[in-house]
Curated annotation (Swiss-Prot):
Lineage of origin: Bacteria, Thermotogati, Deinococcota, Deinococci, Deinococcales
GO terms under biological process: translational elongation
Protein name per Swiss-Prot or TrEMBL: Elongation factor Ts
Gene name of the record: tsf
Organism: Deinococcus radiodurans (strain ATCC 13939 / DSM 20539 / JCM 16871 / CCUG 27074 / LMG 4051 / NBRC 15346 / NCIMB 9279 / VKM B-1422 / R1)
Function: Associates with the EF-Tu.GDP complex and induces the exchange of GDP to GTP. It remains bound to the aminoacyl-tRNA.EF-Tu.GTP complex up to the GTP hydrolysis stage on the ribosome.
Pfam family, one: EF_TS
Family: Belongs to the EF-Ts family.
PROSITE patterns reported for this sequence: EF_TS_1 (PS01126), EF_TS_2 (PS01127)
Region (Involved in Mg(2+) ion dislocation from EF-Tu) location: 76-79
UniProtKB keywords: Cytoplasm, Elongation factor, Protein biosynthesis
GO CC annotation: cytoplasm
Amino acid sequence: MMESIKKLREMTGAGMMDVKKALADAEGNEDKAIALLRERGIAKAVKKGDREAKEGIVRFAVDGNRAAMVEVNSETDFVARNADFQATVEKLAQAALQAKTNDVEEFKNFTVDGETVGNMVAATAGKIGENIVLNRVAYLEGQQVAGYVHSNGKIGVLVDLAGGDEAKAKDVALHVAAERPQFLTRDEVESGDIEKEREILTNKALAEGKPQQIVEKIVEGQIGKFYQERVLPEQTFVKDNSLTVAKYLGDASVNKFVRFEIGA
């Protein structure tokens, strides 16, 4: 129980007694407790992925209209900053360009200079003396491809644009790193998630004493905001808050994006 209270407090920003009551009302179900906290106006919206954190780094490699990215986890940040560890991850990013796969297990069996990727990771772990895990790999082939890694190496992004130029692709990659979009279009959002959000917002508005006749308008406005916070083209552009990403791109558009974040 105490572990759940601690976790939900960190995730929602709610007080201990509020979290404890919500968990009791939800019979220990954490997701239901979060929904109750939101309905009661106590908790902010919680994004999926705001959970446990791991150490490690993300690296990418680009070759013309192709790009690849890897996430490799370590037990400690000290090792994540180790030169041998970083050199291995850089080599893995280059290898991922050749492997052309989004499947980690397939990538582990890919051979580089006579050695499998899996063995390369194991050898580095043995040398450093810490468990190292190849967690994710991404490969992208498109029209206008760019990558971005945040200065601390914890966040990496690949982007492919239809139209536009390299500068715009890099700007969008930086935006994706900073603003964490979850979807490329509204159609990608599960209808069940929207209905759940609508129910929470409706219950919250009614609990606040809002008149029934205006609750629907309030909720639809908030659903619009829900999309604007999560759907990439609808987000406010990070480098110019007078524009959405779609308006910044003009005639160009995003074909695909991939975002890795350590621990997410």
